[in-house]
C-alpha cells in the first residue's frame, strides 16, 4: 500500500538495522516462549503471511500445535509478507481480526 510505504520511510523511529540489544531480546523472548507455550490457555488468533521473510510460517504452525488453548484459530494469508495489516488486502485482515475479537467480547 503506497501510503504505508511512504509513512514507513518517514518514521523517525524506523531503522534499517538490528541492534545487539534487540537481537538479545528476541533470543530471550523465543527461549521464554518455548517454555511458556504449553501453559498458554487464552483465546488465540494466529495470523501469518505465507511469504513472511522474517518469521517462519512453521513457527506459527508449531505454536498453534503446542498451545493448550481450546479457543484458537489460525489463518495463513497466501501471498502476504510480514506486515499483514499493511498489505494490499489489509481490509480483509482487519475485518477477520475484528470479527474474531467481537465473538469473544
Residue ranges and their predicted role:
Residues 20, 56-60, 86-91:
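Conserved strand-to-helix beginnings and helix N-cap segments that scaffold or border functional pockets
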Residues 67-70:
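Short helix-capping segments at alpha-helix termini
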Residues 73-105:
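Catalytic active-site module of serine/aspartate enzymes centered on a nucleophile-bearing elbow/loop
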Amino acid at each position: 500500500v503506497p501510503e504505508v510505504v511512504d509513512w514507513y520511510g518517514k518514521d523517525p523511529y524506523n531503522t534499517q538495522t538490528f541492534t545487539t540489544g534487540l537481537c538479545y531480546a528476541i533470543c530471550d523472548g523465543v527461549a521464554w516462549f518455548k517454555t511458556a507455550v504449553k501453559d498458554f490457555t487464552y483465546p488465540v488468533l494466529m495470523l501469518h503471511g505465507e511469504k513472511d521473510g522474517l518469521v517462519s510460517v512453521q513457527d506459527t504452525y508449531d505454536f498453534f500445535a503446542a498451545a493448550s488453548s481450546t479457543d484458537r484459530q489460525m489463518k495463513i494469508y497466501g501471498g502476504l509478507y510480514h506486515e499483514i495489516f499493511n498489505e494490499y488486502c489489509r481490509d480483509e485482515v482487519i475485518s477477520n481480526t475484528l470479527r474474531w475479537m467481537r465473538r469473544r467480547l
